[in-house]
Curated annotation (Swiss-Prot):
Gene name linked to the record: trpF
Top EC category: isomerase
Alphabetical keyword list: Amino-acid biosynthesis, Aromatic amino acid biosynthesis, Isomerase, Tryptophan biosynthesis
PANTHER family xrefs: N-(5'-PHOSPHORIBOSYL)ANTHRANILATE ISOMERASE
GO molecular function terms noted in the UniProt entry: phosphoribosylanthranilate isomerase activity
Lineage, highest ranks first: Bacteria, Bacillati, Bacillota, Bacilli, Bacillales
Similarity annotation: Belongs to the TrpF family.
Protein name per its UniProtKB record: N-(5'-phosphoribosyl)anthranilate isomerase
Length: 204
């Protein structure tokens, strides 16, 4: 099971997450409690292992701005949380992830229409896109087609207490956590460690 830690804002957390086995780190450039500047993101990314995915999170940003930040920071993927369509995705010409809020099984069908490398299924959006700590009914994704499952990233309120059930139900390619590995709004490296251990153990 691949694991993504999202909302990275400091070097120490990023390095520790990689040491503990994180496969991907997320850097939020959209409005968020976890927003990071491109300059700081670049400093962190330059110190990370080559095999770890560096994912930039954007919401309804222009293609030009996304391309500039991607190139300057050394991102490997972009994660799109807004109303981006296939025309914009094609123009980006960057490995991409489309985030969709899940409210019904029909969201699986909608997901198959996007020309992205991965689909991230999340809780329906609130004030901020993602990172709200709320789950959605995982059983809505229990019967997805194999070709979609193989590119599915599961997010939305995941933590050490529910990650095993979430993985058993959805069987995604990757799981994504942000608020579930925080204490009082800050990333907690011990929670990150335990989350990664549990996610990888229950998928063996």
């Amino acid at each position: 099971m691949k694991v993504k830690i999202c909302g990275i804002t400091d070097m120490e957390t990023a390095k520790r997450a990689c040491e503990y086995g994180a496969d991907a780190l997320g850097f939020v450039f959209a409005e968020s409690k976890r927003k990071i500047t491109p300059g700081l993101a670049k400093e962190i990314i330059q110190e990370l292992p080559a095999n770890v995915l560096k994912i930039g999170v954007f919401v309804n940003e222009s293609v030009e701005v996304i391309q500039k930040i991607t190139e300057n920071c050394g991102l490997t993927h972009v994660q799109l949380h807004g109303g981006e369509d296939n025309h914009q995705i094609r123009r980006l010409n960057i490995p991409s992830i489309k985030s969709l809020g899940v409210t019904s099984e029909s969201d699986m069908k909608n997901a198959q229409g996007y020309e992205t490398d991965y689909i991230l299924f999340d809780s329906p959006k609130e004030k901020f896109h993602g990172g709200n700590g709320k789950t959605f009914p995982w059983e809505l994704l229990a019967h997805m087609p194999k070709e979609l499952r193989e590119k599915t990233i599961l997010a939305g309120g995941l933590n050490t207490l529910n990650i095993e059930e979430a993985i058993r139900t959805v069987r995604p390619y990757m799981v994504d956590v942000s608020s579930g590995v925080e204490t009082e709004g800050k990333k907690d490296v011990e929670k990150i460690k335990q989350f990664i251990i549990k996610a990888k153990e229950c998928s063996k």
